[in-house]
């Protein structure tokens, strides 16, 4: 899938996929929401509104109130690519979220996922 196709996807379509990935591994929607708010700076009410809106996934990240400065500590592979090596900034932000949800699904603690240690 090209970057542009990812950017044009509706957040209302992507958000349930992220939540379902966590739920399948006995994690919660609240944990996914905590990860998203930590990464993007959106408040919980803003996130809930955006999750049901027609905003594109690209604009969801472009308009993020405050991307967490510790997001650069996120390392590892998602979709076969090291997130820290992704050169296109918007795609890197999107893959950071993918990586964090992957870590949640793999059973990591929220403290480790949110780089609190």
Regions found by a protein language model. Give the residues of each.
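A charge-rich, low-complexity, intrinsically flexible signal that marks solvent-exposed coils, linkers
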Residues: 1-117
């Amino acid at each position: 899938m090209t970057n542009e196709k990812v950017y044009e996807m509706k957040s209302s379509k992507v958000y349930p996929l992220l939540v379902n990935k966590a739920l399948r591994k006995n994690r919660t929607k609240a944990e996914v929401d905590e990860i998203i708010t930590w990464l993007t700076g959106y408040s919980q009410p803003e996130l809930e509104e955006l999750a049901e809106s027609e905003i594109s996934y690209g604009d969801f990240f472009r308009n993020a109130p405050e991307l967490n400065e510790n997001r650069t500590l996120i390392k590892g592979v998602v979709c076969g690519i090291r997130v820290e090596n992704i050169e296109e900034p918007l795609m890197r932000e999107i893959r950071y979220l993918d990586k964090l949800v992957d870590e949640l699904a793999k059973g990591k603690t929220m403290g480790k996922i949110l780089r609190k240690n």
